[in-house]
């Protein structure tokens, strides 16, 4: 990545604005149907590539700008300056953290967290929807009640405590004395809907993993 001067950066943005103005004035009437489809494909590729440029700027703001300079948190600053909602700003910060360039504590440049996915985005091969699916594949399982139980094992503290108390009170309440022995209710089998997986889901997962997701991080990236 080249270290451009401020004047060069301004010229690049000005040239991009000028070319977009020219493109906006085109009527496309002379194109055939295949050519229009190809033009839409190229336009989609450009739209997908633009967020990759923003990742660099957001990560630099996150590491170099103070809250005094931003006028608050980075999320609030992006929401106010870009006129977007705070959830959208938070999502852009998260995308930049995963897909943007990084630096080690020593200042050494590091590859993005999701290296292959970031490369595909810079090439315009994938968009926001694809990235959302890829990140969901490696999302940690949600916790219930602050703890995670092993698969196939459920915690029922209420039922367990009632069972223990009934066993302890059994010798103290023989038949015919004290409280009557409660009648046992018939056991009810509860059925739970089972999740059905699409037969092609494993193949799709392997394909996405091999094409877009990064290799295991090496020791130099830690």
Swiss-Prot record:
InterPro entries in the cross-refs: DUF222 (IPR003870)
Biased composition, class Low complexity, residue ranges: 160-169
Lineage top rank: taxon: Bacteria
Region Disordered, residue ranges: 142-222
Biased composition (Basic residues): 182-196
Protein family membership: Belongs to the Rv1128c/1148c/1588c/1702c/1945/3466 family.
Protein name from the UniProt record: Uncharacterized protein Mb1614c
Biological source species: Mycobacterium bovis (strain ATCC BAA-935 / AF2122/97)
